[in-house]
From Swiss-Prot:
The entry's keywords: Acetylation, Copper, Metal-binding, Metal-thiolate cluster, Phosphoprotein, Zinc
Amino-acid positions noted as binding a divalent metal cation 5 in the UniProt annotation, renumbered to this chain: C35, C37, C38, C51
GO molecular function, one term: zinc ion binding
Known role: Binds heavy metals. Contains five zinc and one copper atoms per polypeptide chain and only a negligible amount of cadmium.
Post-translational modification N-acetylmethionine, affected residues: M1
Coiled coil: none
Protein name: Metallothionein-3
Record: residues binding a divalent metal cation 1: C6, C8, C22, C25
Protein's organism: Macaca fascicularis
Gene Ontology CC annotations of this record: inclusion body; nucleus; perinuclear region of cytoplasm; synaptic vesicle
Annotated segments matching region Alpha: 31-68
Classification via Pfam families: Metallothio
Region Beta: start-end pairs: 1-30
Length: 68
């Protein structure tokens, strides 16, 4: 299923659990983050996340605006 068009109802369970990259996804049960910079275990990252840039493992965690 196309991760950009898969259904991600607000507050609902995510049907694209393994590749949740839906724009504006607000699922509460995404198995992975909706933006590549967020760690999979960050529940907040299933909602509004903005990537700030950076490189490396540590920067990956730091640059995610919703994982603080």
């Amino acid at each position: 299923m196309d991760p950009e068009t898969c259904p991600c109802p607000s507050g609902g369970s995510c049907t694209c659990a393994d590749s949740c990259k839906c724009e504006g996804c607000k699922c509460t049960s995404c198995k992975k983050s909706c933006c590549s910079c967020c760690p999979a275990e960050c529940e907040k990252c299933a909602k509004d996340c903005v990537c700030k840039g950076g490189e490396g493992a540590e920067a990956e965690a730091e640059k995610c605006s919703c994982c603080e």
